[in-house]
Amino acid sequence: MLVLAKSSWVRAFFGVVVFCAAAGDVARADQAKTGSQQQPAADAPAAAPAPDKSGYTLFNPTPDSQLRSFAPDRPPKADSATTVDAGHFQYETDLLNYSQTNFGGVTTRLYQAFDPVWKLGLTNWVDFELQFNGYQNLTATDNATGAAVAKASGFGDVFVKSKINLFGNDGGSAALAIIPYVKIPSDAPTISNGVVEGGLIAPFQLQLPHDFGLTLMSEVDALKDAADSGRHANFVDLVNLNHAVPGIKNLSAAIEFFSSVGTDPNTPPIYTFDTALIYLLTPNVQLDAGADFGLNRAAPAVQVFVGLSQRF
């Protein structure tokens, strides 16, 4: 049954990718017909046209001189709306991640090291992504007695994704993408729930005045119920605001409000306030660090991390 479930999830995943790719073609065709979203005033100087990158593919890579600005998904929970350029490879990873949750009379501590996301640009507007949840060590302790409630260690789940940009990949003040995904469970008890899950993510980015960047993201997931083998819908929404740090070149900061609310009565909602610092070491290497803070009991009280991203 698990093999059949995995097969159906994979077929559904690639079906969504094909559908979204077709939608992206329609959106780009409409944009080409109508021109830019806002026509310049008659006396405004004409902007240089963006280079045509539509012909670049995995086997005909985008030249380095035409690469878009480096935009990893990390460090916040929000995903970027732009894809990896065709024929280029990118990885993003936590170097170390620690979280602590106090809920239901139990304190849970989780350490995680190296959870890489590998990305490969397939076309100018589609990339393929594999996310490996790294090695995790979990301990849960009863607050009243100090006794260990649970201990577990092992490697986490694998997420298979495809990011499809609908518009804004190569210029403009707005960008939108859709990201279908499937989760393939690991065999680590407690670390993984052992069930194939999936969903669809939609990040929207907007460039605001005074160099502020805004990301609005919504996500819908089909997840396993906490108490049985049933399924429920889960809804993720977040707002992310970022800006360069004045006086420090290549350093920016981000804040984010995150919510995850499902229809399973045994799965509590999660609300967090997230912060991050991002330093662009080179045009293709990014370092980051951050701290997330729980806004309700079920959320991790604190989560801290440092990470690295690089493009080739």
Where are these regions (language model features)?
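Bacterial N-terminal signal peptides
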Residues: 11-22
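Sec/Tat signal peptide C-region and signal peptidase I cleavage site
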Residues: 25-29
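Transmembrane beta-barrel domains of Gram-negative outer membranes and organellar outer membranes
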Residues: 30-312
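N-terminal secretory signal peptides that target proteins for export/translocation
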Residues: 1-9
